[in-house]
Design a protein with these regions (language model features):
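Rossmann-fold dehydrogenase core element
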Residues: 29-47, 67-70
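Predominantly a Rossmann-like dinucleotide-binding segment in NAD(P)-dependent oxidoreductases
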Residues: 48-139
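Beta-loop-alpha module in the N-terminal Rossmann-like domain of NAD(P)-dependent dehydrogenases
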Residues: 1-33
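Hydrophobic residues in well-ordered beta-strands that form the structural core
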Residues: 16, 41-43, 72, 186
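Short strand-turn motif at the edge of the Rossmann-like AdoMet-binding core
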Residues: 18-19, 44-47, 75
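Contiguous beta-strand/loop segments that form the cofactor/metal-binding neighborhood of enzyme cores
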Residues: 90, 109, 113-187
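Alpha-helical elements of Rossmann-like donor-binding domains used by nucleotide-donor carbohydrate transfer enzymes
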Residues: 2, 6, 29, 55-58, ...
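A short helix->loop->beta-strand "cap" motif at the edges of active sites that frequently abuts
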Residues: 10-12, 37-39, 156
Length: 187
C-alpha cells in the first residue's frame, strides 16, 4: 500500500506482484484508492500463463470432466528448513518479517499461488474454509505451514496445503480436480 498509493493518486496504472498487502484492511484501502482514481491495477500470477494449466482450465470449465466434486492444491517447499536467524538470505528477509509479510508468511508467499490456481482452473469461489496455520521451523516467528479445508460455491470440497518447511520440497506446486465424469491433474 505504501509503495502503490502515490502512483495510484497520480493516476498511474500498476502491475503489482504478490502479496498484494499484508492485511485485509490495507487491501480494502487499496481497492478504494483504485476505484476512486479509476486506474488499472493488475496483480500478477505467473502460473496461469503455463500452457498446460490453460489447457486444464479449458477441460474443467468446458464440462468435459463433469461437475467438479473435489479439488486439491499443494505447494510444498523446503526453503525455511533449518534456517537460522543469523543465516537469513537477503531474499528471505521480507518473508520472515511479520511486519512486511503479514500475519501468515506462508499464505502470503506461496498460499496466494495455490489459491489463484484453484480459482483460475475451476472458476469456483471458496464459500467456507477451515485452516490450521503453524510454525514448524523452530527459529521462525512467522507461519511456515498451512492446511486449509474448503467448501466451494458449487458445494464441491477441496484442500490447500502450502509449506516452506517440507524438507526436500522444491517448488512442488500441484493441482488435482476430480469431476463427476473424469479428472485433471497438473504436477
Amino acid at each position: 500500500l505504501k509503495i502503490a498509493k502515490p502512483f495510484i493518486e497520480k493516476g498511474i496504472h500498476i502491475i503489482c506482484d504478490k502479496p498484494l498487502t499484508a492485511t485485509i484492511s490495507d487491501a480494502e484501502t487499496l481497492k478504494k484508492l483504485v476505484d476512486k482514481n479509476k486506474i488499472i491495477f493488475a496483480l500478477t500470477h505467473n502460473y496461469s500463463a503455463y500452457p498446460m494449466l490453460r489447457e486444464a482450465k479449458k477441460i474443467v470449465t468446458s464440462g468435459k470432466i463433469g461437475k467438479v466434486n473435489l479439488v486439491n492444491v499443494e505447494y510444498p517447499q523446503g526453503y525455511t528448513v533449518g534456517i537460522k536467524k543469523k543465516d537469513e538470505k537477503k531474499t528471505l528477509k521480507w518473508r520472515l518479517d511479520k511486519r512486511i509479510s503479514g500475519p501468515s508468511m506462508i499464505l502470503s508467499e506461496i498460499g496466494t499461488h495455490a489459491y489463484h490456481l484453484l480459482r483460475y482452473v475451476t472458476e469456483l469461489e471458496i464459500s467456507e474454509l477451515s485452516a490450521e496455520v503453524n510454525t514448524l521451523s523452530k527459529e521462525l516467528t512467522v507461519d511456515d505451514n498451512a492446511f486449509v479445508l474448503l467448501r466451494l460455491n458449487n458445494n464441491a470440497r477441496g484442500s490447500i496445503w502450502v509449506s516452506s518447511a517440507a524438507t526436500g520440497g522444491e517448488n512442488g506446486l500441484k493441482i488435482r480436480v476430480y469431476g463427476s465424469k473424469g479428472a485433471v491433474e497438473w504436477l
